[in-house]
Regions:
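Catalytic-site signature of metal-activated, phosphate-bearing donor transferases
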Residues: 1-62
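Charged, long alpha-helical assembly modules
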Residues: 94-112
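Inward-facing hydrophobic residues that define packing positions of alpha-helical scaffold repeats
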Residues: 64-65, 103
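Short coil/turn linking the two alpha-helices of tandem helical-hairpin repeats
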Residues: 55, 72-75, 94
Length: 112
């Protein structure tokens, strides 16, 4: 079930895990991949997203903040996605003001 919905005329963004696919192997494989290749910013991003999908809010926030600090994490759309995932994790932890701040950062990162 989707969480809170924000509307802006002409804009819609939905990103939810595909419930038709088994995700049982994603997390252990991503954790292994990041241990083996800690400088692979793409897999760090995916690991943080997977923590979000699993409701592991603190792991999500920590991992995605690390992703944003990586010198190779330059793709602005992916950086903005990490910020949105951090925002959603903050929201789910009851930190609405922090969530708002992260959403605003995401908009600034990739305003298109």
């Amino acid at each position: 079930m989707p969480g809170p919905i924000v509307t802006a005329e002409g804009v819609q963004l939905d990103h939810h895990p595909d419930q038709a696919k088994s995700r049982s192997q994603y997390l252990p494989l991503l954790e292994l991949s990041v241990r083996e290749e800690p400088n692979d910013d793409r897999n760090v991003h995916y690991l943080g997203r997977e923590y979000l999908y699993r409701g592991r809010w603190d792991d999500c926030i920590r991992t995605l903040k690390h992703h944003l600090s990586m010198p190779t994490a330059l793709w602005r759309d992916e950086r903005a996605a990490s910020m949105r995932y951090i925002a959603k994790a903050c929201w789910n932890k009851g930190s609405g003001a922090q969530a708002r701040d992260w959403y605003l950062r995401a908009i600034t990162e990739a305003p298109h």
